[in-house]
Amino acid sequence: MTSNRSNLLFSLVLFHFLFVPTQLQALNTDGVLLLTFKYSILTDPLSVLRNWNYDDATPCLWTGVTCTELGKPNTPDMFRVTSLVLPNKHLLGSITPDLFSIPYLRILDLSSNFFNGSLPDSVFNATELQSISLGSNNLSGDLPKSVNSVTNLQLLNLSANAFTGEIPLNISLLKNLTVVSLSKNTFSGDIPSGFEAAQILDLSSNLLNGSLPKDLGGKSLHYLNLSHNKVLGEISPNFAEKFPANATVDLSFNNLTGPIPSSLSLLNQKAESFSGNQELCGKPLKILCSIPSTLSNPPNISETTSPAIAVKPRSTAPINPLTEKPNQTGKSKLKPSTIAAITVADIVGLAFIGLLVLYVYQVRKRRRYPESSKFSFFKFCLEKNEAKKSKPSTTEVTVPESPEAKTTCGSCIILTGGRYDETSTSESDVENQQTVQAFTRTDGGQLKQSSQTQLVTVDGETRLDLDTLLKASAYILGTTGTGIVYKAVLENGTAFAVRRIETESCAAAKPKEFEREVRAIAKLRHPNLVRIRGFCWGDDEKLLISDYVPNGSLLCFFTATKASSSSSSSSSLQNPLTFEARLKIARGMARGLSYINEKKQVHGNIKPNNILLNAENEPIITDLGLDRLMTPARESHTTGPTSSSPYQPPEWSTSLKPNPKWDVYSFGVILLELLTSKVFSVDHDIDQFSNLSDSAAEENGRFLRLIDGAIRSDVARHEDAAMACFRLGIECVSSLPQKRPSMKELVQVLEKICVLV
């Protein structure tokens, strides 16, 4: 019995020593090279590489790895790695040269990660490579020049990185390359000619200059995007002549000049494909090209000949002066007095018609727009005593402050299209009533209205006239550098929020411009967007009318929350918002912003005092499109975003055009503030908020220490949902715009989180 047990133990030990080396040897060269890549990864938050280790018999079962039977049966090289696909796995690290030493690697997809550094020179050494997708990372530096080895390459995606230098000419000479995307980098220099096999070629949003190459692309090209570069000069007539007629070509926002060639593929484009080129002309643009004059003197005409005689046709019949009667031709002519009378009558008739048309136009214009009217519409005098020194032509009326405005943070309820500074009129400044310099009164005591002043509604639903609005009770809600906001309560109890815009703050010089912008904003309708109802136009001031939202703004809530946390008692905030209510606010904000971005719009100035709360605590986004109604100079100093605002992304100071990822960043800051009652700062709080531990227990403990004490008990019951929200906020405030999710993705994630609560 003992002998049998000894033999069994020996067999087990022998098996261990024999089996383990054999197993290690079974990991072929491809697996070793992949492990070298794994060890270059600094962070793997989703643990996607957890099953990559030496103990496996083959790398073919590893996450993201695909193998194909290419070698001899029953040998370590029977299955070879042909594909490595790990997109959007939040991997941080560098791309090692050994990765491209895998001899049969055909597909490499590491897009939408956090890889940095430069591409190794060996990137194009894998002769079997057919697809390289490294887009949406943080790779930088120049591209390797030697690309002759990858003759089988069909797809190259390096978009949304930080590559510099020139695009190697060898890339454009690859015969099998059909899809190329190098957009959103900082490539410079000339656009290389070639890309004959390309079907999709996207070089947009770079710094490419020089002229358009004549032999770019070929008969297979279906999509060409060279927009947002610095390409200059005229478009060659030979450019795009090989393109199919249904190809999409985008040359917008360059420095192109001259006429657009008449090739069919260019004529079939929309005008937007050529916009942003100030000196470009011809179809499909509506800008006509100037034609140089080629007129010259008619032949055989003497310089002394009268022009009238010069163009008179010569008679071919001979004239006999003896048989011609002197007055024969004179009888067929009109008398000079008759000609003069006809001419005068024509001039008088045309003048009368012109005056009639002008009169009708002016009458219609006055009926539609109160251009010449000057009305003093709720000119607020916020000074307590100085307001009583008004002119005799006006009557002072005192109105009580809106009860809803008596909040901890003062008059911070805000209106659509309105930006309110955090320094709005406070309760101590108001003393329960505010002096309003009302309309000029008539002898009968009624409010005086100019006959030419009209109110224009833009939503197609509201029935409101200026008489009714003039009789409304007015409550001051707040003041900004561009005007005053008040709550107007009609006789039937309906309330509107009205913003008064001073003429010097208004960007529109004419009523039609103002109406066009207001109607464009009013067309955006969503449950989480405030509704614009109408406007008034006057020489001295303009009014913007919208729905009144009764529950204040997030600014009021945050201010009250911070006051409560700094106080020893909880009296400052008797009914704090629960975690479920805050999650509801975040979801509503995401829905509204996603709708805005889907309509190709950007809010660009999301912050707590632009998020209103209705009676059900649903968020209502305001301030959309106000930048189009305000002058840039005033807007940038009063209501626009400032470089010191924590709700603006880091790239705000260097970007000229708002981007949807601005809204994502602002949303992330507010989401973190909803969870922690602290304002995230990319300069000071990045370590505190985003440097999470590898240990799940330590990570959860760190999060619970950051959470707002008012909802800590709620979070304990919904810890997974709260942690998911916290991680989502961290992703939104990434310093790299391409790393932030889209608003549509945020809505999808928040909808799933809400199911857990």
UniProtKB/Swiss-Prot annotation:
Residues 1-26 form the signal peptide. Keywords: Leucine-rich repeat, Membrane, Phosphoprotein, Repeat, Signal, Transmembrane, Transmembrane helix. It is found in: Membrane. GO terms for cellular component: plasma membrane. Residues 638-654 have a biased composition (Polar residues). One of its GO terms (molecular function) is ATP binding. InterPro entries: Kinase-like_dom_sf, Leu-rich_rpt, LRR_dom_sf, LRR_N_plant-typ, PRK1-6/SRF4-like, Prot_kinase_dom. The chain crosses the membrane at residues 339-359. Residues 633-654 are annotated as: Disordered. Pfam families: LRR_1, LRRNT_2, Pkinase. Belongs to the protein kinase superfamily. This is Receptor protein kinase-like protein At4g34220. It comes from Arabidopsis thaliana (Mouse-ear cress).
